[in-house]
Amino acid sequence: YRDGFCQAEKAEAEKLGVDVYNLLNEKAAQVPAGSYGTICCFRDVMNYIHWTHASPTFTNFELDPERFNKYTFYRAILENTALLVRGHIELVKDATGNEPDELVFAGGASKSPLWAQILADVCHKRVRVPQVKEATALGSAILAGYGVGLYPSIAEGAHRVVKWEQTF
């Protein structure tokens, strides 16, 4: 989406020396929850029995550039993704009877407070963002520490090393 529709924002971000997603999130935060009714369907909840995939679509928008613009569509993408996470949590709960009490939002997407808040609102769960966003590298370091005896358990290693930046 960024590369296909947000060239002006990419140029502005480069000029300002900021991440383009900061600009997109700032504008999308001004769009009300529900994106004025715009429905994004870029993905669908996994169907493991009949492997299907939704065709990417936007529906229920009007030709009104004040309300229905690239920031509305961007927010609708974030909302769609949050709904997918909720759907997958429900699938796991239906299959196992268990669901997480909270979600950890790591990686590049965790740099978006807007997306983390949307995820918390849609899933009705606390979303925690770690200080170290690259969870794979941090997890590898924790496992290495456990492997050489630095930590008595993996859980203890995680408890000592993982620090939380923000909770939504």
Residue ranges with predicted function:
Residues 146-168:
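Cytochrome P450 heme-binding "Cys pocket" and the immediately downstream C-terminal segment
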